């Protein structure tokens, strides 16, 4: 596919404007979280009240939370008050490889939970009580050239991002970097499994037709965050590491792209960037867009390097505002940030020499590399937003109504 925009500028969601009416609202000092998970937080680690580089979160309709705890190789179920209810590891799944590396998590319309297990090339399906139901997909080790061959239908190398439609169809990103990279240009594999019934049992079948029609792996280069529109017609993906060749994107601005859920074809819609002369010239996101979530008429997106959550109008694409600030006591593994004699980089956090969760104030929305996100209306009618505050080793919880009243 040619990435030249031709005449689709009129379809673009231009989100940067000098208009006073469209100036985004910063909610960082206006709205604060009402709580965190774990509620008795103890920072980075493997304890019951600890998380170690959590990646994603999914809010269940009863107000409980599922968290993928990556460095601990476990899936955690927390109650609505932030207490640990259950933990699932390789042993519980009867897998010999302890490094299951759980990453993405999603739910379907019937409340089943789906978790991508990057380390073992599978998707695990659970009941709403986190009781194991079945695996979806099978592990494999194949080349990019052979990935879509018939004999490799449904196999997975390193599944990460996942989203599930209400009808149970599963969409997963196979982020095997060194398999799909060509000439230093990144790409990934993409699979859809559709739900079916065989002998009165729920089964998942690989959708070869979707694989043949989808344009996702042509338009995108590195993605993990995905979400589906309320009408179950549009699939949204976040671009983490774009190339200059994508839409004349010389500044490599990050964006969110829209695709048809049934066919995977590109819908000529981008969020988070502005266009001039058929090229992307500016963008909202600092350096990385991670988790995304749709709620009613809003699209929420995590700006990882900016330490905040960005809000868009789903229909117009307008950039409405954001919440969060980059945590002072944190820098990534490639940096050093020595403060009062302590280096708050990721290596020191893992080693226990730095404890940013004690320094960064969650009540002030100070986020250290936020990642996954989830938004939902609970069974009791309350509306909740959850954000993974990765290197502060916690999940931030917001009253979604307090956020949205600023945009309604």
Task: List each language-model region with its residue ranges.
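Conserved beta-strand positions in repeat-built beta-propeller and related beta-rich domains
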Residues: 67-71, 115-119, 155, 172-176, ...
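Short coil/turn segments that connect the beta-strands within blades of beta-propeller domains
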Residues: 62-63, 110-111, 167-168, 231-233, ...
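Blade-level signature of beta-propeller repeat domains, shared across WD40, Kelch, NHL, RCC1
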Residues: 367-408
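A short loop-to-beta-strand structural motif that recurs across blades of beta-propeller domains
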Residues: 74-76, 121-124, 179, 186-192, ...
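Beta-propeller fold detector
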Residues: 24-40, 85-91, 132-147, 200-215, ...
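Beta-rich, blade/repeat-based domains predominating
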Residues: 44-60, 93-108, 141-165, 215-230, ...
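A short helix->beta-strand "capping" segment at the edge of beta-propeller domains
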Residues: 22-50, 354-359
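Short loop/turn segments that connect beta-strands within beta-propeller blades
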Residues: 79-83, 127-131, 194-198, 260-264, ...
């Amino acid at each position: 596919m040619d990435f030249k925009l031709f005449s689709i500028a009129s379809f673009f969601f231009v989100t940067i404007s000098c208009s006073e009416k469209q100036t985004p609202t910063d909610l960082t000092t206006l709205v604060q979280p009402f709580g965190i998970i774990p509620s008795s937080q103890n920072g980075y680690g493997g304890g019951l009240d600890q998380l170690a580089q959590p990646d994603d979160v999914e809010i269940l309709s009863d107000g409980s939370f599922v968290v993928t705890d990556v460095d601990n190789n476990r899936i955690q179920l927390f109650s609505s008050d932030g207490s640990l209810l259950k933990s699932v590891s390789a042993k519980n799944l009867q897998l010999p490889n302890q490094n299951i590396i759980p990453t993405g998590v999603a739910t379907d319309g019937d409340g089943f939970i789906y978790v991508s297990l990057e380390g073992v090339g599978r998707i695990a399906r659970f009941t709403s009580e986190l009781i194991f139901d079945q695996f979806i997909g099978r592990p494999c080790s194949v080349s990019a050239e052979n990935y879509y061959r018939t004999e490799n239908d449904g196999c997975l190398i390193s599944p990460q991002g996942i989203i599930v439609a209400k009808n149970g169809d599963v969409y997963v990103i196979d982020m095997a970097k060194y398999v799909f990279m060509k000439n230093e240009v990144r790409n990934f594999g993409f699979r859809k499994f559709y739900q079916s019934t065989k002998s009165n049992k729920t089964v998942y079948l690989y959708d070869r037709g979707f694989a043949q029609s989808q344009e996702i792996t042509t338009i995108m280069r590195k993605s993990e965050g995905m979400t589906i529109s309320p009408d179950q017609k549009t699939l949204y993906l976040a671009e983490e590491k774009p190339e200059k060749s994508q839409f004349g994107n010389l500044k490599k601005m990050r964006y969110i792209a829209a695709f048809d859920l049934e066919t995977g074809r590109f819908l000529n819609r981008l969020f988070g960037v502005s266009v001039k002369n058929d090229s992307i010239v500016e963008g909202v996101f600092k350096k990385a867009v991670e988790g995304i979530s749709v709620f009613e008429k809003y699209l929420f997106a995590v700006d990882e390097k900016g330490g905040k959550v960005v809000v868009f109008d789903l229909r117009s694409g307008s950039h409405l505002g954001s919440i969060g600030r980059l945590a002072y006591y944190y820098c990534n593994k490639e940096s050093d940030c020595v403060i009062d004699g302590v280096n708050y980089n990721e290596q020191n956090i893992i080693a226990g020499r730095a404890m940013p969760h004690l320094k960064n104030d969650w009540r002030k929305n100070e986020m250290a590399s936020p990642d996954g996100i989830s938004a939902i209306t609970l069974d009791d009618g309350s509306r909740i937003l959850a954000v993974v505050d990765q290197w502060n080793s916690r999940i931030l919880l917001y009253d979604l109504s307090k956020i949205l009243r600023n945009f309604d």
